Amino acid sequence: MSEKLKVGILGGTGMVGQRFISLLENHPWFEVTTIAASPRSAGKTYAEAVGDRWKMTTPMPEAVKNIVVMNVNEVEKVASEVDFVFSAVDMTKEEIKKIEEDYAKTETPVVSNNSAHRWTPDVPMVVPEINPEHMKVIDFQKKRLGTTRGFVAVKPNCSIQSYAPVLTAWKEFEPYEVVATTYQAISGAGKTFKDWPEMEGNIIPYIGGEEEKSEKEPLRIWGEIKDGVIEPANSPVITCQCIRVPVLNGHTAAVFVKLRKQPTKEQLIEKLVTFKGVPQELGLPSAPKQFIQYLEEDNRPQISLDVDYENGMGVSVGRIREDSVYDWKFVGLSHNTVRGAAGGAVLCAELLKAQGYIEKK
């Protein structure tokens, strides 16, 4: 591969922005050349702007320390420096929708970690192993925006990554009712225990907006493009409870499923461990070699042992067993800020590059 694509990170000083910067260090295709954040950070070096708020466990990459942070609101100026941007801005939903489209209108592709555009009908919301074909809706979005190369693409909520891939792998058995309870890490709120000491030894049985996202977003991912928009699927019915637990990284889900066709346990496991998608076929740089692993031990998956499976880009499943109320039950685990956030967005960008939607300006 020749010259790397120049990448900007919008909202680069926050937790997800930091995760983007960590993940993109030494990336074979992409190089972070521009970081944009709020006006109060603009004009400082990245190291000064972040100060003692670096939340990653690995050190800040040397290559970004002296990048001078730009004002994220100076759209034309930031856009002129990059081939595409990742968005992790912290604003209101309406502000995010506007600023992401403003960047797209400068002919700069936007790959967003935010939820603002997830239900914009012509914006693809993609898990690359599940619905890569949804990227085709970008052609309709460009007509609406009046662009030739600018668009917005998004990744779904972190909570669904522990069970949506499993249900996709079991599609031929026709899941029709799903009950899920998610146990979600504090990094999902952009926090560490240092920022949120009251979470130590505590559980909060509510995460604002999370249950609706967890119930509805999988249906959009399983939907189809019709008349230039994505029409969500109407089955299975999913009901969720989302609980904040005292864990730094990793979302666990306890899931019950009703299936129209009854497989054996061995068939269910076989479908998981052989499940592959376009990222695996293309060998994309961030793609896990095996997307879903099944663990036979009764006490797995565990955060401390399994959250970093496939560099945080894989899903770990365990405890598949028959159920007396539903048909089957299982426990899933995924890394909420890697696969569930920045890593998932990086994989989307790799897919978009492979599909020809992202290229050098």
Regions found by a protein language model. Give the residues of each.
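N-terminal Rossmann-like NAD(P) cofactor-binding subdomain of oxidoreductases
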Residues: 2-205, 237, 309, 316, ...
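Charged docking surfaces used in two-component/phosphorelay signaling
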Residues: 187-361
